[in-house]
Amino acid sequence: MKILKKHLNTVTMKVKITLMFAVVLAVQACQAQDLSDSQITVKILSYNIYHGATTRGDYNLDVIARVITDADPDLVALQEVDFNTNRSGHIDLATELGIRTHMAPLFGRAMYYDGGEYGEGILSKYTFIRTRNVPLPYTPGNEPRTALEAVVVLPSGDTIAFVGTHFDHLNPETDRVAQAEKVNDVFTSSPYPIILAGDLNAQPGSIPIKILEEIWSASYDKIYPEPTFPSDAPRKTIDYVMHFPGERWETLETKVICDSIASDHCAYLVTLKLLKD
């Protein structure tokens, strides 16, 4: 009887250990899944920073940096970025914002301006492994435009490309149409899943946006697109995040962040999930 009881106790202990081991494995599997999901989720912010000036007319980069930091993006496309211009006090806006947000900065010149340079910026939580600055077509006499690209590696090990741009603001939309066509021609041949973000100065349904959406998938609500400009009373949707190819990305969340002091534009935050092949 004692032998049988001892045997039963041993079996019971083995069952308990087995169950505990199974629970541990299940928890580890869930944690691994959560980690995997977080590793392939990318938060993108598009932000026209009004050449570093607030809507009050002063230069307060801490206000702009706070909007970015509070949004906690992985990659930021900055538009209207000054480098060493007279009006911004001869500072490097991209680098200064990078310092304040603890992100790697990148600047791409669209034109020489006011004793310095003016163009696009990118901030990134990840190291740049390749960058390029692509001039976009424009009508002589109009403002030159560019598209700035950075290739980065995510914590998951996946490589993606990120492009920030700022299309022409004038009418007719001749330059915007040409710029949309150039972006399609240049960047959709990327060997990596790619994200496009920026102030496109065009509303949903316009010709430039239709051209882009022939190839790119947009993140905004097609039925009720949320306006992003001006920041004090938004009524126009002109800031975008798009991605390509469509089957590699899923839009998880979008958010328009309006700080009426930091800039005349709202910031546009989009959370994307990179899907496996």
Question: Each PLM stretch: what is its role?
Answer:
Residues 56-63, 89, 142-144, 175-182, ...:
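Soluble or luminal CAZymes and related metallo-dependent hydrolases
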Residues 8, 14, 19, 23, ...:
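N-terminal, active-site-proximal structural segment of metallo-dependent hydrolase catalytic domains
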Residues 42-49, 64-88, 150, 161-165, ...:
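Active-site beta-strand/loop signature of hydrolases that rely on acidic residues for catalysis
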Residues 85-90, 103-122, 141-144, 191, ...:
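Active site of divalent-metal-dependent phosphoester/diester hydrolases
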Residues 47-50, 79-81, 108-111, 124-126, ...:
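Active-site-proximal beta-strand/loop segments in catalytic clefts of secreted hydrolases
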Residues 51-58, 132, 173, 228-229:
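Short, solvent-exposed loop/turn elements at domain surfaces
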Residues 154-174:
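Metal-dependent phosphoester/phosphodiester hydrolase catalytic core
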Residues 35, 41, 56-57, 75, ...:
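Structured beta-strand-rich core segments of catalytic domains in phosphoester-bond hydrolases
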